[in-house]
Amino acid sequence: MIGRISAAWARCELALAACLAVSITALILLNVVTRSLGAALFWVDELAIYAMAWMAFLGASAAVHFGHSVAVTILTDTLPLALQKIAAKLVDGIVLGFALAMLWFCWRWFAPLALIQSGFDLAAFQGATFNFVYAEPTTTLGLQKHWVWSVMWVFALGMTLHGFANLIGQGANPEDERS
């Protein structure tokens, strides 16, 4: 069950990452055209950067599900098969630990309970926590940066899901996909 949920989530991550890749290309082309016409749109660069960040985090999370992450296997290739499997589970455990740490950092950074306790009053929240995550605007888009930074939640939740699925043996098997 968890493996199917992980696979569906990874497909969604990849689909959204692909849409973002197309949007980055379109934004860069728009930027080139408008600059060559002498009417540059000042917000295009920032939006392309944010789209690229979202694309990278979504792709990285999906890569964990599909087992397509970068790996140095010089040591594990020399091990007997049984030890290779143990090493792979150890890596899956470390990835899950990293994902859980990311969730914890997001929890600390966004402080949702403190925000609720302040009655969603940003001034009271900032005064009590000295946390200005919800107040900082983007440079040119006029959006609150917490919307941009929310990709960290998506990344951490996806990595946790994929890491757990891989650890219990329900993640995608890269060897099965190659055949």
Predicted regions and their residues:
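Alpha-helical transmembrane segments and membrane-interface helix-loop junctions
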Residues: M1-S179
